[in-house]
Regions:
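Basic, low-complexity terminal or inter-domain segments flanking catalytic cores
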Residues: 1-117
Length: 117
């Protein structure tokens, strides 16, 4: 596992907001999940529609694991890697890495099922 990988990754809503919306951890009725802050009325303009984009903890862990594996494989091969523009989809969730430095990996995610609601 890559050291501090959880702290390096920042996840943002990929639902085309004017400004970046970093996902926030939420306590759901049955489990913890990450959601777009634009879901809550206090974080949006009155005419703005609520954003339902969210990701479960299981899917979040999968995302971290995927990124970690890519970095580990490159490290094992002794080859430098930059994951900027790397895209993948799993369970109707699209991921794209838009920034990759030694300190930060910025990921935009879009849950196609949640956004339809």
């Amino acid at each position: 596992m890559i050291k501090n990988i959880w702290n390096m990754i920042e996840v943002y809503c990929g639902n085309n907001h004017k400004e970046d919306q970093k996902l926030e951890i939420q306590n759901g009725m049955y489990q913890i999940f990450y959601a777009c802050p634009k879901y809550h009325i206090e974080n949006r303009n009155p005419e703005e529609r609520a954003c339902n984009n969210r990701i479960s903890m299981d899917d979040y862990e999968y995302m971290v694991s995927t990124i970690s594996k890519l970095l580990e494989d490159a490290e094992m091969d002794n080859s430098p890697i930059n994951l900027k523009n790397y895209k993948w989809t799993k369970k109707n969730i699209e991921y794209i890495i838009t920034e990759h430095t030694n300190e930060k990996i910025k990921v935009y995610m879009r849950n196609k099922v949640a956004i339809k609601k």
